[in-house]
Amino acid sequence: PAPSETTGESTPAPSETTGESTPAPSETTGESTPAPSETTGESTPAPSETTGESTPAPSETTVPSGESTPAPSETTVPSVPSGESTPAPSETTELRIIPPEVSTVAVPVTTGQITPAVTTEHSTEEILTLPPPVVGPVLPAKPTVDISKYTNTTTTKSTVPTTTIPPKATCCGSSGESVQAGHMWQTGCDVCTCNGTSGKTQCAPRQCEKEIICKSDERRVLRKPGKSCCGYCEPLTCKHNGTEYKLGATFIDKSNPCITYRCDASGLTVNVKSCPNEQVCSKSERTYDSDGCCFSCDTSCKPVPATVGIQGEYDYQNEKTNCSANIIMAKCSGQCQHKLTYDTIDNKVVTKCRCCKADRVEPRKAHLVCDNGKKKIYKYKHITSCKCTSCTAYNIRL
């Protein structure tokens, strides 16, 4: 059998590199350079296949465990403590493993014998080649800025006594609710504030933006809660006995018709009316003017209507019965002029009185109603005219 092919020289190229890649060498005639897998601490020889009997011819020399150098595919970056950051280098360190040089010696072969190939190991030394480290920014473990010059290194103990601020008091609001200190609200025409120190409510009149200017026929009302807090103008009016009168109105005093009031801008003015040629007569003989203040006595003697009640007892079919009725008659009314004369004999003033009396009459009838339901005819004289005559004259019988 032909011996298995032995690798003349083998140069492993790592399958993975970080940062830079190393290409595998090209194949040469008579020599094959396989690309080994990742190197671990030991290499296991791959026995060659033989016909009949197999004699292992290791293609790779076993590397002693004491001299094995792992070829990591990736570079391990040391961990950085908390608070410090170290940037990773831009290029990964390349680990290059140079395997020992192996040579094969040809041995004469006798017919019928299988002679394994003899492998002579010239060197078992492994060389680890590292590129120069890449210099990059490295954060220091401690800050490089000296902050001592920005701070006061001397420590002084404060001697200022600490004071405890008491909680702010609350106040009672307009509706009885509790309000916080400094809270403001409006009640009527006042603005109230809660005093947080004393817990009392302080109120002051509301401040108005502009002054109210009224016309000559108006007056200024300063404050009227519910209508205006800053004042307003209203027409001038006058009040008398609970009645309000507009500006320029006139009215008569109800208790004294001779007094007239007038409502002016300055208030009420009073005018008392005087009655000329006052006369003396009974109230029934007075005729008043339109104001009801002055009157004149009726000097004309004339008949005026008067209601007279008539009642009597009468015989009706031999029975007595009471009959009565109210009849509208006439009477003489008016004032007659009196005459004054001087008596030279008695040396005194004599008054001649004249009275208003009936001058003419006419007969009339009236119906009286009796208790038995019957009616009785009553005859009387109705005055149709009057005149002033001497008071001693006899009266006309009615």
From Swiss-Prot:
Predominant cellular place of this UniProt entry's protein: secreted
InterPro entries: Cys_knot_C (IPR006207), Cystine-knot_cytokine (IPR029034), Glyco_hormone_CN (IPR006208), VWF_dom (IPR001007)
Organ and tissue specificity: Expressed and stored exclusively in mature mucous glands of the skin.
Cystine pairings recorded for this chain: 301-356, 323-370, 332-386, 336-388
Post-translational modification (record): Extensively O-glycosylated.
Pfam families for the chain: Cys_knot
Residue ranges annotated for the CTCK domain, each copy included: 301-392
Sequence repeat ranges per the UniProt record: 1-7, 8-18, 19-29, 30-40, 41-51, 52-62, 66-76, 83-93
Bilayer-spanning residue ranges: none
Start and end residues of each stretch annotated as Disordered: 1-101
Source organism superkingdom: Eukaryota
UniProt-listed PANTHER family: MUCIN-19
Its biological purpose: Could be involved in defense against microbial infections. Protects the epithelia from external environment.
Protein name: Integumentary mucin B.1
Organism: Xenopus laevis (African clawed frog)
